[in-house]
């Protein structure tokens, strides 16, 4: 008798509070955005971060520290300001990897639990992920300017040196901006596709 009464109460509850059906459009958009974020992180890890025509070298994440040591070991010019810029660059890249991990984790939680709050938080994080490679562009260009200033005493020997030939952003930064930009846009669009209510049933 109690089971029958409980069953009737449950039916009344579900009649008043109809279930919601998952938005598959939002699910697919979130999944694609998550993959793009992972691709951006992989590109920043594997592809060249910047190139130096003057040193005839392309530098990826693994070669970053060795590149800094090469410049620090030479005694011809003072590159302390340039090394500070590279340290700032490395810190931003590490933050980028952390935010990508947070973004991917939130995306997985969104795919599983499908909560609007998770979508909003993930969109905010995705904006931070997008902002970092854009900032890296300015850091790399500023570092190139610092290095060009340090090389001014040697211009009589090597001639005029353009900052872009000393240091220029490469594939990893460009790819990260493209991938994270598209991902942030997809996360934004997914916010407009909410769960739909299923017709009331007894």
In which residue ranges do the predicted regions lie?
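Cytosolic juxtamembrane helix and N-cap/initiation of the first transmembrane helix
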Residues: 2-59, 187-202
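Hydrophobic transmembrane signal anchors and adjacent membrane-proximal interface regions, especially
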Residues: 20, 50-52, 69, 97, ...
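Signature of small four-pass
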Residues: 26-41, 92-140, 187-194
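Long, glycine/tryptophan/cysteine-rich extracytoplasmic
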Residues: 40-91, 143-171
């Amino acid at each position: 008798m109690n089971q029958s009464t409980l069953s009737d109460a449950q039916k009344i509850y579900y009649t008043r509070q109809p279930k919601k059906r998952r938005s598959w459009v939002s699910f697919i958009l979130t999944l694609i955005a998550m993959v793009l974020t992972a691709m951006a992180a992989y590109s920043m890890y594997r592809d060249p971060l910047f190139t130096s025509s003057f040193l005839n070298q392309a530098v990826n994440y693994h070669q970053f520290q060795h590149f800094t040591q090469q410049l620090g070991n030479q005694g011809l010019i003072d590159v302390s300001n340039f090394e500070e810029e590279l340290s700032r660059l490395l810190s931003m890249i590490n933050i980028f990897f952390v935010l990508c991990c947070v973004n991917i984790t939130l995306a997985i939680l969104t795919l599983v639990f499908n909560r609007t709050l998770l979508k909003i938080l993930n969109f905010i994080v995705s904006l931070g992920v997008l902002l970092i490679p854009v900032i890296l562009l300015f850091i790399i260009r500023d570092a190139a300017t610092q290095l060009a200033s340090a090389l001014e005493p040697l211009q009589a020997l090597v001639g005029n040196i353009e900052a872009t030939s000393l240091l220029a952003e490469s594939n990893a930064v460009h790819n990260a901006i493209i991938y994270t930009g598209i991902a942030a846009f997809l996360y934004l669009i997914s916010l407009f596709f909410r769960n739909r209510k299923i017709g009331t049933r007894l």
